[in-house]
């Protein structure tokens, strides 16, 4: 065949292919047009976290036996446990316990392996500060229970559950 005819056929095939790709993109775009938005207006709306959400660690000072299991299982040796050996009763007495949330990776190993369940994960995830030294929580700060976002009437909570199609 003539070279001009083959070039014209290639041009026609490329035009049809381009139109098909544009049509596919248009169909995908239009299918998303009738969906609800996924974004939330953050300070005024918050998602309800899942049951197993790994937020800030809560610490109960009275339950801790200073066994240091949390330090041994932590991949970055993060919890700082200060204790004193009471020689008369041959037990450790906990003096200080602190975690630096600027370094913590929230893996949950300390909570999982704690033999006395003195550590637990909370639903609190707003830990941002202007000074990184404020992220070093001692046993008093770790012992505070977070305010539940469900109880806060100024914030609209949004349940984050996947839709079940029937």
UniProtKB/Swiss-Prot annotation:
GO terms for molecular function: 4 iron, 4 sulfur cluster binding; iron ion binding; NADH dehydrogenase (ubiquinone) activity; quinone binding. Residues 55-84, 95-124 form the 4Fe-4S ferredoxin-type domain. GO terms for cellular component: chloroplast thylakoid membrane. It is a peripheral membrane protein. [4Fe-4S] cluster 1 binds at residues 64, 67, 70, 114. It catalyses: a plastoquinone + NADH + (n+1) H(+)(in) = a plastoquinol + NAD(+) + n H(+)(out); a plastoquinone + NADPH + (n+1) H(+)(in) = a plastoquinol + NADP(+) + n H(+)(out). Its EC number is 7.1.1.-. The keyword Methyltransferase does not apply. It is an enzyme of class 7 (translocase). Pfam families: Fer4. One of its GO terms (biological process) is photosynthesis, light reaction. [4Fe-4S] cluster 2 binds at residues 74, 104, 107, 110. Keywords: 4Fe-4S, Chloroplast, Iron, Iron-sulfur, Membrane, Metal-binding, NAD, NADP, Plastid, Plastoquinone, Quinone, Repeat, Thylakoid, Translocase. It is found in: Plastid, Chloroplast thylakoid membrane. It comes from the Eukaryota. Binds 2 [4Fe-4S] clusters per subunit. Its cofactor is [4Fe-4S] cluster. Belongs to the complex I 23 kDa subunit family. NDH is composed of at least 16 different subunits, 5 of which are encoded in the nucleus. NDH shuttles electrons from NAD(P)H:plastoquinone, via FMN and iron-sulfur (Fe-S) centers, to quinones in the photosynthetic chain and possibly in a chloroplast respiratory chain. The immediate electron acceptor for the enzyme in this species is believed to be plastoquinone. Couples the redox reaction to proton translocation, and thus conserves the redox energy in a proton gradient. This is NAD(P)H-quinone oxidoreductase subunit I, chloroplastic. The gene is ndhI.
